Amino acid sequence: MPNEKKPKTKCVEYLRHAEYYDMRSIFDELYARSQAGEIFENLMDVILSRENILLAYRNIKSNTGSITPGTDKLKISDIGKLTADEVTARVRKIVKGAKNGYTPRSVRRKDIPKPNGNTRPLGIPCIWDRLVQQCIKQVMEPICEARFSNNSYGFRPNRSVENAIAATYRLMQKSGLHYVVEFDIKGFFDNVDHSKLIKQLWSLNIRDKELLYVIRRILKAPILMPDGHTEHPTKGTPQGGIISPLLANVVLNELDHWIESQWQCNPVTENYAYRENAAGCPIQSHAYRAMRNTRLKEMYIVRYADDFRILCRTREQADRTLIAVTQWLKERLRLDVSPEKTRVVDVRRSYSEFLGFKIRLRKKGKKYVVQSHMCDKAYKKVKASLTKQVGNIKFPRKGRGEAGEVRLFNSMVMGIQNYYQLATDISIDCGDIGRTVNTVLKNRLKSGKTHRLKKEGRDLTKMEIQRYGKSEQLRYIAQSKEPIYPISYVQCKNPMSQRRKVCAYTAAGRSEIHDDLRINTFLLLQLMRAPTYSRSTEYADNRISLFSAQWGKCAVTGKKFQCISEIHCHHKKPKGIGGSDKYENLVLVLAPVHELIHAVDEDTIRSYLTALKLDTSQLTKLNKLRTLAKRKPIDLEKPNLTNNSHNGMTKETKKSV
C-alpha cells in the first residue's frame, strides 16, 4: 500500500464515541429542544435504546474506574464477554423488568484519605448499576447543559480548572473586584436533599416520571460500609457514582442563576444593546455603568463543583453577600456552610485559596496584578509525596522494579507541573520543592562513594526533548538509564478562558474542537448494527474502533471497503489458541484476504493470490498475520508455496462480521 499521509484531525473522545453509535444527532436534538424550553416526558425510550446502552458500555470501558469492582465483584470485562443483545436485554430488565421497579444493588463504601487527616467517603456502585447510570447521564447531560450557567466549570464537557482560574484572574485583575467571599459547604455530597433535587430536575423540564423514579432509587441505594453493616441514606448522593457530578451541578445551578440575577444577568441589562467579544461573551459595559448608580450589589460567581467563590467590588457588598448566600443556601437548598472556612478576603492584603491555588493582587505601578502560588497544603503534600517516591526508587516495591518506580516518579512530576503551572509563581514553588527533592535524590541514590545519578542515559523521546531537553538539571539512573524529570524545570502558563462558542451539542460549537469522521459513515453504521450472533460486546465494540482507525480500509491491501459483506474481523492470535477479543488482537481485512490468512491448501492459496495480486509490502503484512495464526508464510519463489501437510481452512474464516 503506498504511503499515504493521513490528515490530522481534531478529536474529542466522547464525541467520537457518539458518532460511532449514531447518537450525536439525538443528543443535538435534546440540547436544542431544552434551549427552546420544551418539556421532556418520555426519555426512557432513548435511555434504553440499543445504541445508547452500547455507547454507555464503550464510555465506561474507556474509563480507568471500570476495573474497580462493586459489591458484586464484577468488572466491565465481565459485561464485555456477553453479546450485545444480552447486554441490552439485561439493562432493560434491570430498569423495567424487576417486580418492584428498578432496585440498585448496595454501593461499596471506601474511605479515601484527605490531606487534613480526614477521609472522603467514596461510593462504588456495582458495574451493572454504573452502566444504567451512564445510560441516564448521556441523555440527561445535553438537556441540562442547555440550562446550566456559564459560570460553573466542574464536571462539564469542554470546561476545566484552567477556565475557572482564568475567570478568577480576570475578575480580580481586569474587573477590579478585590473582595473574595470564600464559601465551604459542609459535606455537600452527603447532604443533598433528595426531594429538592427531584424538584430541580422537574424545573429543568425533565418530567419523565419513570426516569425520576429511577433517579430517586439511585439516590437511595443502600451503602455497604467497610465494617460490613448496611446503611439506607435519606439524603446525599454518593461520590463515585457516574451520575453524581451531573446531579451536583443540577443542585447548585439554582445558586448560579440566583447570583447572576443580582447583577450579571439582572433584567436591567435587557434595556441595553450589547455586542460580543472575540470569545463570544456579551459586552455589557453600558448596562453595568447604569446599574452602578442603583442599589444593586455587584457580584460574580466562579464555581467548580461544590467549591465556589463570589467576587465583589466593596467590603460592604462582600459582607452582605456572605450573609445573604449563607441564608439562601440554608433556606432554598437546605445546605449549611462551615463558619470557620467561610470568610471575606481582601486579595490586596492576603491570599484567597481556590482549587489548590492561593491567589492575591500585588501593586505594580498604579495597578494591581495577580500573584498566585500553590496553596500551602498542596505544597507540603507535593514535597512529601515526591520525597517518599524517591525512597521507592532506592527500594523498589514488589513487582515494579527500579525503572517502574522512576516512571511513576516522572508521571507524578508531570502531573504536578501540568496542574500548578497556572500559578504565576510556580517556578518559585517548584524551585523550592526541587532543592529538597534533589538533596534527597543525591543522598538516597548513592552506594558508598558511587553516585547512581548520571548526566547521560537512554535517548529521550520527542516529548521529553521538547519539555526537558534544555534542562541542565536532567539526570539519569545509572543502571536503568531512565531519566528523572526535574520538578523545578517549569514555567507559568497563562490560563485560557472558556470559549463560549464551543459546544458539544451544536454543529458550529463542535467544529471548534472536533472534526467529523472522514470515512464512510454509512458503512460504519451498518457495521455497528450488523448482527454479531454469539460474538462478545467487546468484539463488536472494538470492530467499530478498527474501522475508524483503519480509515475504512483493509489492513493488508489498503483498499476501501465497499459493502458490509467485504469486511471480515480477524483475530491475530486465534481464540482457539488463547486469543482474545481485545482491540490489539483484532484487525479488519477483506473477505478473500481473511480466507488467505487461514488457507493451507496450495490450490486455494494460488487462487486467492491470483485474484488479489498482492505486492511485496502487502505480502509481508499477510505473512505476518499468517505467522501469528500459526500458518506457514507464503513464499512465491518456491514451487510449494507452504510446507503444510494438511488441507482445508479453519472455522475462523467462516465467521465474518
What are these regions (language model features)?
Residues G576-E584, L596-E637:
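Polybasic, low-complexity binding patches
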Residues T537-H568, L590-P592:
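Short cysteine-rich loop/turn motifs with clustered Cys
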Residues K5-T9, A18-I242, L246:
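Conserved pre-catalytic core of RNA-dependent polymerases
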Residues S106, N150-N151, R156, N163-P339, ...:
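Conserved polymerase palm-domain catalytic core
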Residues I433-T436, N443-S534, K613-Q618:
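Extended C-terminal regions of large enzymes
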Residues K220, H229, L333-K398, G404, ...:
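A conserved non-catalytic segment of reverse transcriptases
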Residues D184, G558-A591, A599-Y608:
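Histidine-centered nuclease catalytic patch
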Residues P2, S372, D376-K455:
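Right-hand nucleic-acid polymerase module
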